[in-house]
Amino acid sequence: MRSSVEIYNVRTGRAREVWQTDRLVEAPNFSPDGSYLLMNGDGLLFRLPLDGGDVVKVDTGFAINCNNDHGISPDGTEIVISDKTEFGKSAIYILPIDGGTPRLITQNLPSYWHGWSPDGRQLAYCGIRDDLFDIYTISVDGGAETRLTHGEGRNDGPDWSADGQWIYFNSSRTGLMQIWRIHPDGTGLEQVTSDNQGNWFAHPSPANDKVLILSYDPSVFDHPRDLDVRLRLMDMDGGNLKTLFELFGGQGTINVPNWSPEGDEFAYVRYFPVKS
C-alpha cells in the first residue's frame, strides 16, 4: 500500500501532496503552529515537517503499538496517544511534545482518544465497556471518567467544537452511522446528519463554522480501510452538506483532528494499492 499525505485548502478547493511513502501511515494532525504534521505508522509516531525536511520519529518510550488515535494539546506542549503495548488493549497516555515517557491517563480499557478540549483540561474518547461503545471524557490528570452516551448503538469518534460547547461524534443509534453532538456535561443531545451515507469522524474547524466528515456507502459496516470514500463539509448544525472530493481510503484517512491552525486547510491520507 502506498500512502499519499495531502493537504486540502477549503478556500481554493485545491489539494497538494506533501509526502508519499510505500509504508502505511495514518491520521495526520497539524501542529498548533502549522509547521509540521504528526502521524502514525508501524506502531510509532512521526513528524513530517512542511518545509520539506526529513520525517522524524517521535520517542514514545515503551509505547510501540500506537494506533491512529493520537493528537497534540492546544498549547502545543504535549502529545496524546492510544497504545496497547502495556496492557494488550488500547489505553490513553500523554507525553511531552518532543517525546519521552508516556503517562497513563485511562484506567479503564480499551480506550481510544479522539478529542482534546480547547482549554486543554479534558480528553474525549471512545471507551468499550461490557461490549458497549460509548463516549467518555476524563481530566488530563487522569482519575474518574465521565460517560456521556449510554449504549444506544455504537458511539465513536468524539471531537470538540472550538468554542468548547459541543462534542461531535458518530453514532449508529438510529441504524446507519450518522453524526451527532452533545454538550460536555451530557445534555443537549442532537442529531446533526440524517442522510443515506455512513458518516464518521466529525472534525469541527478552528473557526467554529464548519465540520469535516468522512462518508462511506451505506452498505459498509464499521470504518474499514481501502474503500472509495468521500470527504464532506457542512455547517455546524449539519446544513449545507457538500462533497469536497472522493478518494481511496477510509480507516486512517482522517481519524483524528486534522485542521490547520487557521482553519483554511486540513490534512488527510489517500491510499494507492501497490501492484505485485
Question: In which residue ranges do the predicted regions lie?
Answer:
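Beta-strand-rich domains and repeat architectures in extracellular enzymes and scaffolds
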Residues: M1-S35, M39-N40
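Structural motif
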Residues: R2-V5, L44-F46, G88-Y93, L132-Y136, ...
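Multi-bladed beta-propeller domains
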Residues: Y8-L24, L50-N65, L95-P110, I138-D156, ...
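Conserved beta-propeller blade repeats
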Residues: D22-L37, I64-I79, N108-C126, E152-N170, ...
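Beta-strand C-termini and the immediately following turn/loop, strongest in propeller blades
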Residues: L37-G43, I79-E86, W116, A124-D130, ...
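Loop/turn-rich, solvent-exposed surfaces of beta-rich toroidal or solenoidal domains
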Residues: G175, N196-R232
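C-terminal closing repeat unit and adjoining cap/tail of repeat-based domains
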Residues: L227-F272
